[in-house]
Amino acid sequence: MYSPIPQSGSPFPPTVKLPGLHIWRVEKLKPVPVAPENYGIFFSGDSYLVLHNGPEELSHLHLWIGQQSSRDEQGGCAILAVHLNTLLGERPVQHRESQGNESDLFMSYFPHGLKYQEGGVESAFHKTSPGTAPAAIKKLYQVKGKKNIRATERVLSWDSFNTGDCFILDLGQNIFAWCGAKSNILERNKARDLALAIRDSERQGKAHVEIVTDGEEPADMIQVLGPKPSLKEGNPEEDLTADRTNAQAAALYKVSDATGQMNLTKLADSSPFALELLIPDDCFVLDNGLCGKIYIWKGRKANEKERQAALQVAEDFITRMRYAPNTQVEILPQGRESAIFKQFFKDWK
């Protein structure tokens, strides 16, 4: 079970309570602050804590798990999340975010979309800095989606391209936003915005950005990628966001540690649920895993062990139910319930 770091050894600064966005990369059980100019860049081999403090003490704490992050890093991220949540008086709603399956709320913090880069902590130490010669940079990113646009690093080759998406070819001093003939307008706008963001945040504004239409590739692109072959066709269906609001695909469980171990008791196997089932003395699992999400509701009078074990309970539940590892998790303190959570219950105003 994840346990908090002693208060006397808090690795978080007092500024953690200030409004706005705070991001840390987890490194050897320590939170390493991410510079604001690098917000939205995530290394696939790492885990991150993302805290957003909004108005009226409305906070959301996200654990972002990279596809290639180690179990140790993920465990360290969970331990730090428990500590940070306690430090903030257990006010934040907690979310577990998996690379490529982030929540809409998480995506809203990054108007230019996300950029995934290969590697982990070691790669982060050697990434481009203001003193690095930009001419040495050669990276390719695929920009894909309709509602939530993400940029993912790809192999530097025409084989990575298709006609249905947009791609960013970052050559340091020149940044090309290439738009496939069948790409959608949202992808094109995001590709342009992300290319400009790379220029401004990573090149201090000293790079040339060019929007490239499929079939009108400049010589610099051909020089790096070679002669352009016939490209794969894009699949517009892949860009559709699945509807995750089917309230019937749900079940409600009560969490108890009365025996010294965390046990689950099913209270109802279909929604809408009776609101009276949620009592302040306990924690509950709302299983909407078939639609990609698990909720943990923490009663304000539940014991500390149950409250702090919420994330572990969710992860064990996902494993037990054989749901996808990237299933989203949302942990809600009593009084911080979202509208989506409330829709599973009868007459919750």
Swiss-Prot record:
Pfam families: Gelsolin (PF00626)
Ranges occupied by Gelsolin-like repeats: 27-75, 149-189, 262-308
Coiled-coil residue windows: none
One term under GO cellular component: lamellipodium
Sites bearing N-acetylmethionine, chain numbering: 1
One Gene Ontology term from the biological process aspect of the record: barbed-end actin filament capping
Protein name (database record): Macrophage-capping protein
Organism: Bos taurus
Gene: CAPG
